A protein has these predicted regions:
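Solvent-exposed loop/turn segments at secondary-structure junctions
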Residues: 68-71, 107-108, 128-133, 165-170, ...
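Boundary at the C-terminal end of the N-terminal hydrophobic targeting segment
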Residues: 45-47
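N-terminal targeting leaders characterized by basic, low-complexity, disordered sequences
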Residues: 1-10
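A short, glycine/acidic-enriched catalytic loop
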Residues: 129-156
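N-terminal Sec-pathway targeting helices
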Residues: 15-38
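Active-site-proximal C-terminal subdomain of hydrolase catalytic domains
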Residues: 159-221
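A domain-level signal for caspase-like cysteine endopeptidase catalytic cores
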Residues: 50-125, 139, 162
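Active-site microenvironments of hydrolase-like enzyme catalytic domains
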Residues: 121-133, 176-186
Length: 221
């Protein structure tokens, strides 16, 4: 046991990783964490105030967080995605006079209800997917489903953001094109595969990467 403790102590406190040791790495990460919290907490507080007290109109952006937000099903995927995105996304939509309404472990029925309810003007979908669909917590939602519900809802006048892979699929139309009244406001990634770093970037910057890729893609049409 003493040998094990001694070895652990060596690797944590004495061994150098390049020109720095574990203690220096830990202190650096700790400092970064506190700097991030210094920004995150005030931004979250501001978002809560604007979303719940300042905005009066019942106009919403629905944010559908699938249980498959990262990889395989994980109950904590939705809460983690919420914590990471709440300040930036709420302030983004609040600046456009929309409140945010988060759906944890969102289902196919949640998506259908959002389409039908006219108070939802913008839609954000987080989870596995493609250009023709999105994997809700309970089942896959596709262009076929949206076309089946067409007579139940009016097209949305806000924005569509889909944080998922954007592989080519069965139909030429993106699923968002069937929902929104302006296809130029249907935002999705340009590559076949979208990584976690891309999701994180858009979570903390208010969709800047996705909007950049979409606008660049639209210019080449």
């Amino acid at each position: 046991m003493k040998k094990i403790i001694k070895k652990v102590r060596f690797h944590l406190l004495e061994k150098k990783y390049g020109s720095i040791g574990f203690v220096q790495i830990y202190r650096f990460c700790k400092k970064i964490f506190f700097y991030l919290m210094f920004l995150y907490i005030p931004a979250s507080a501001l978002a809560i105030v604007t979303n719940n007290m300042i905005l009066k109109e019942e106009r919403y952006a629905a944010i559908l967080l699938s249980g498959y937000a990262f990889s395989d099903y994980d109950y904590w995927a939705s809460p983690i995605a919420f914590l990471g995105s709440y300040p930036a996304w709420t302030l983004y939509f609040n600046s456009n006079s929309l409140k945010t309404d988060y759906f944890f472990n969102a289902t196919k029925e949640d998506f259908k209800n959002v389409l039908i309810d006219p108070k939802y003007e913008s839609i954000v979908m987080v989870g596995h997917g493609s250009r023709n669909g999105w994997k809700a917590t309970d089942s896959f939602v596709s262009n076929d489903d949206v076309n089946e519900w067409k007579e139940l809802f009016e097209t949305k006048k806000g924005e569509w953001f889909q944080l998922s892979c954007a592989g080519q699929d069965t139909y030429p139309e993106h699923i968002g094109d069937l929902v929104m009244d302006n296809t130029n406001k249907v935002y999705y990634y340009s590559g076949e595969v979208a990584g976690t770093t891309m999701f994180i970037t858009d979570a903390v910057t208010g969709f800047r990467l996705m909007k950049y890729q979409t606008n660049k893609r639209n210019l080449t049409k």
